[in-house]
Amino acid sequence: MKIQFAPHNVPFERRLQTAAVLQWVFSFLALAQTCILLFFVLLFTRFWIISVVYGVWWFLDWDTPSKGGRRGEWLRRHVIWTYMKDYFPITLVKTADLDPQQNYVVGSHPHGVLVAGAFTNFCTEATGFHRLFPGITPYLLMLPLWFRAPFFRDYIMSGGLIPSDKDSASYLLKNKAGGNAVVIAVGGAPESLDARPGAFTLLIKNRKGFVRLAILHGASLVPVFSFGENELFDQVDNPRGSWLRKIQEKLQKMMGVALPLFHARGVFQYSFGLIPYRKPIATIVGKPIRVEENPNPSSEEVDKLHKIYMEELSKLFEEHKTKYNVPADKHLTFV
């Protein structure tokens, strides 16, 4: 394989953008493991008191992630996210107002490999979420296991992430004052196994928990689609039914996280590595779907609203796809 190295005269601004994305990839793939290791290593050094004090704090603070978390605007507004946004670049597009007196369940599609669009738009202020949607506070859901990692849990809570379980989402949606938007990557980790350039396959047909959640609390549903999310990485071929896909699916069920074999570019060369390609992402926020509150929704009611949601998501995709270089004959595939 011929390696294409980056030129020496890359502008300093672009180097900062690459560095910002590098730290994000590291935080996504290895920061939790590093924090766990650090916690235990410190116990066997003269700095053992740090882990002991943190352990006490951790015990007292155990339920915070499921009760709205602990946001840190200093982190959400840090300049590093602006550099990351400009690397791709990433844009947030508003198609309708969101009433700050209402709560929302936002469905984000597709998951992609590393959820770059959803993270940048809803966990940082780099794309101006609060300017576009004043009075709305977004909370991105993440696997609960990551909130059990010392130090790392505080970092992700600062960005506005909360555990992806019913209790955590309900805590926010029960607030009658409104203004909370619970953002769910509906396809979850399994959908990342279908993330590759040109793919528009969404794992949603049997994913109805987010719809039921919206009905339970009378929260409006908002479809969101990020054009370009699946263009960031190549992935080893793993068609459904292949031996590789079967292994990945089995590991996903055992571990709770998917393991897509992805690759893109490196820091100093463009031929291989785990740094995403510089491909634009446009996140389109659709119009809200009004939902009537029902503490005991029937299966038929959930199915009906789920169908409406998929229709609105398809409509959102079709209305905007040509603006983002998606061929006219390409359509969403729901599985």
From Swiss-Prot:
Transmembrane segment boundaries: 24-44, 47-67
A Gene Ontology molecular function term for this protein is:
2-acylglycerol O-acyltransferase activity
Q: Which SUPFAM superfamilies match?
A: Glycerol-3-phosphate (1)-acyltransferase
Matches recorded under Pfam families: DAGAT (PF03982)
**Topology within the bilayer:** Multi-pass membrane protein
Reactions that this protein is recorded to catalyse: a 2-acylglycerol + an acyl-CoA = a 1,2-diacylglycerol + CoA; a 2-acylglycerol + an acyl-CoA = a 1,2-diacyl-sn-glycerol + CoA; a 2-acylglycerol + an acyl-CoA = a 2,3-diacyl-sn-glycerol + CoA; a 1-acylglycerol + an acyl-CoA = a 1,2-diacylglycerol + CoA
Which pathway does this chain act in? Glycerolipid metabolism; triacylglycerol biosynthesis
GO annotation terms (biological process): diacylglycerol biosynthetic process; glycerol metabolic process; monoacylglycerol biosynthetic process; triglyceride biosynthetic process
InterPro entries per the UniProt record, alphabetical:
DAGAT (IPR007130)
Q: Which UniProt keywords apply?
A: Acyltransferase, Cytoplasm, Endoplasmic reticulum, Glycerol metabolism, Lipid biosynthesis, Lipid metabolism, Membrane, Transferase, Transmembrane, Transmembrane helix
Q: Which GO terms describe its cellular component?
A: endoplasmic reticulum membrane; perinuclear endoplasmic reticulum membrane
Where is the major localization of this protein?
Answer: endoplasmic reticulum
Using the UniProt record, name the top-level EC class of this enzyme in a single word: transferase
Annotated compartments: Endoplasmic reticulum membrane; Cytoplasm, Perinuclear region
Q: Which EC numbers characterise this protein's activity in its record?
A: 2.3.1.20, 2.3.1.22
| Family assignment from sequence similarity | Belongs to the diacylglycerol acyltransferase family.
Q: What does this protein do?
A: Catalyzes the formation of diacylglycerol from 2-monoacylglycerol and fatty acyl-CoA. Involved in glycerolipid synthesis and lipid metabolism. Catalyzes the formation of diacylglycerol, the precursor of triacylglycerol, by transferring the acyl chain of a fatty acyl-CoA to a monoacylglycerol. Plays a central role in absorption of dietary fat in the small intestine by catalyzing the resynthesis of triacylglycerol in enterocytes. Has a preference toward monoacylglycerols containing unsaturated fatty acids in an order of C18:3 > C18:2 > C18:1 > C18:0 at sn-2.
The protein's name is 2-acylglycerol O-acyltransferase 2-A
Give the organism the record lists.
Answer: Xenopus laevis
Which gene holds the coding sequence for this protein? Answer: mogat2-a
